[in-house]
Regions:
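ATP-binding/phosphotransfer module of carbohydrate and carboxylate kinases, centering on a glycine-rich
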Residues: 1-116
Length: 116
């Protein structure tokens, strides 16, 4: 891996798969941060399921086991209490969520107008 080069996560995880030592260090540090954030989320909201998605999850075969292990070791929950899964909606999950939100806002506004 060359210093000063621009790189995305697809390339970074590709280098990790090839055994690049710097890429391994960077990917593990990223996954540590993501996993720590997920553990904080679990402690704050007590979910049964955490859904991960987006382009980064094209490396789910590496990320999910890593995060699952981190959560298993550090979250204050019973074993198998929280399931961490890959989104089935793919890269469009955020757009679909936004569409749902905007549709519900519009519906509430229309209900107010027609109740007058």
């Amino acid at each position: 891996m060359d210093a000063g080069c621009e790189m995305d996560f697809k390339q970074l995880f590709g280098l990790m798969r090839q055994g690049d030592e710097n890429a391994i260090i960077i990917c593990e540090e990223c996954m540590n941060v993501w996993a720590a954030a997920i553990v904080s989320y679990i402690h704050a909201y007590d979910p049964e399921v955490v859904v991960l998605g987006g382009g980064i999850m094209r490396s789910a075969d590496i990320i999910l086991p890593y995060i699952n292990k981190w959560v298993e070791d550090r979250a204050w929950t019973p074993i198998d209490r929280v399931h961490i899964v890959l989104s089935e909606l793919g890269d469009n999950a955020a757009l679909l969520g936004l569409n749902y939100y905007l549709t519900s806002v519009k519906r509430r506004r229309n209900e107010k107008v027609f109740k007058l």
